[in-house]
Amino acid sequence: SSAASDVYKRQEYTEGHFLFMATKKGIVKKTPITDYANVRKTGLAAISLREDDELIEVKKTDNNQDVFLVTKYGQCIRFKETDVRKTGRTSMGVIGMNLTDGDEVIGMQMQSQGDALMIVSEKGLGKCTLISEFTTQNRGGKGVKCYKITEKTGNIVGVKAVNQDNELMLITTEGIIIRIKVSDTTLLGRITSGVKLINLDENVTVASIAKVREDKSLIDNADTSELLSEEEEKESAAIAAENAKKASVENTETDDELMKELLERAEADGSEDEEE
């Protein structure tokens, strides 16, 4: 099981809002946010996980979203949030996506976060595809192809719902970070591989991607309230890259730490939606 930390001190626990969770094995869960109003300092059970599963994403929702799950093998499913019934904190959830052998979910996005999906592969290629190209399906399906995986592209490592005025940061396993404008990328169809976004040295891959606000603070980091200097950005990228390397060998994070990070991301996403 995982534990939730009290990271919603700056927001009210509003009736009708939920925490929507996704795991790498395609399990999704929706719990009323009010269930987390009294989180103990030692944490609070948030979801029950199978031994070989882990939580990858948490979003704050209003029960009116379309949910997008994307896998490392380039599959995507879109379904209504209302297809998932609300459950208590300690429940395991339900099947959101039926995965093929070896595949796993690498990201979850909500319709309100953007009008296109920016998908990036481990070898530095990426593309934007309008969310209108993804038809709504029933929860639990296999989804549709959203990226053409080849030896040149490698597997998918990140997905973000974006608008044309957004920027993204790409972070490599060597701690290199670049910033790209979504407007500089071409809109492409679902079954394509995209274009090169970053030049990588041999044995270097993209570790993660992050969406950037106009004030240049990462929306994925709820504690970042001031602009980062170039030196601080490089240091942050190096830390993220080192963490990515460790995670590829073994799961070094505790459940408490992982849940805290994911809930912080959910808070940041919720704050952004309210600002808009």
Where are these regions (language model features)?
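Short, small-residue-biased leader/transition segments that mark boundaries at the very start
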Residues: 1-8
